[in-house]
């Protein structure tokens, strides 16, 4: 029995390290190496899924092609519901990329045994467990809705800051700063909290007991991806329509 416990302890599934990072030096800048590694993993999964789904396209889809077409239809409907029939098509790739990246990134934190991969410092985790990732995604969303607004309305897009009255100019400007903040911190907080809670429970009690909470975490992670993509589409639609 003691030998079994010793063997099990070789795999630090519940070891928690908060605030430590594995840094890479790139051009004189320090970047979080573990975030780049897990992000590349997520991107590789998405690229591989795309290749498998389009390698031998059939008129009557089946298997993995059928699953990917269902995912594409779901993303298309999401964009259509938020942006409308006339405007949604150019934005399907952007909204879909956001949703799929966040979805796979969130689930990788629960399904991939990152803890057994040792690093000199810090530990591997879901990319969305790092505030830098969520802020980057939120800033991309901000750039997207500014681009959509200026492309659709030209310089007239700036009139939105004076609506419905010029007195609200400071509040309207502040709103553009709070949107990416709320997007990034909501996603970061939910994913970090989920991984910390599951990690503590696995550390304190047997593996079987935290399983229901892990399942709930997978569901919540999927919902967070949906919320982020839906809000991104809604912000883009708002920028093009010119009203709140």
Swiss-Prot record:
InterPro entries in alphabetical order: ATP_syn_F0_a_bact/chloroplast, ATP_synth_F0_asu, ATP_synth_F0_asu_AS, F0_ATP_A_sf
Main location: membrane
Transmembrane segments: 33-53, 92-112, 130-150, 196-216, 217-237
Cellular component annotations (GO), alphabetically ordered: plasma membrane-derived thylakoid membrane; proton-transporting ATP synthase complex
PANTHER family in the cross-refs: ATP SYNTHASE SUBUNIT A, CHLOROPLASTIC (PTHR42823:SF3)
NCBIfam families (alphabetical): ATP_synt_6_or_A
Stated family: Belongs to the ATPase A chain family.
Record protein name field: ATP synthase subunit a 1
């Amino acid at each position: 029995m003691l030998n079994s416990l010793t063997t099990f302890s070789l795999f630090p599934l519940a070891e928690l390290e908060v605030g430590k990072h594995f840094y890479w030096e790139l051009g004189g800048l320090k970047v979080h190496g573990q975030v780049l590694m897990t992000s590349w993993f997520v991107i590789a999964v998405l690229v591989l899924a795309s290749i498998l789904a389009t390698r031998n396209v059939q008129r009557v889809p089946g298997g993995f092609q059928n699953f990917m077409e269902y995912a594409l239809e779901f993303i298309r409907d999401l964009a259509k519901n938020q942006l409308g029939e006339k405007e949604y098509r150019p934005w399907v790739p952007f909204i879909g990329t956001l949703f799929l990246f966040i979805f796979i990134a969130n689930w990788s934190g629960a399904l991939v045994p990152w803890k057994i991969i040792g690093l000199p410092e810090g530990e591997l985790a879901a990319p969305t467990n790092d505030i830098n990732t969520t802020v980057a995604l939120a800033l991309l969303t901000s750039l997207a809705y500014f681009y959509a607004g200026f492309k659709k309305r030209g310089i007239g897009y700036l009139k939105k800051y004076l609506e419905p009255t010029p007195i609200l100019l400071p509040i309207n400007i502040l709103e553009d700063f709070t949107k990416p903040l709320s997007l990034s911190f909501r996603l970061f907080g939910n994913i970090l909290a989920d991984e910390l809670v599951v990690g503590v429970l696995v550390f304190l009690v047997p593996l079987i007991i935290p399983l229901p909470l892990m399942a709930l975490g997978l569901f919540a992670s999927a919902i967070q991806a949906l919320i982020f993509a839906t809000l991104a589409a809604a912000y883009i639609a708002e920028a093009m329509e010119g009203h709140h």
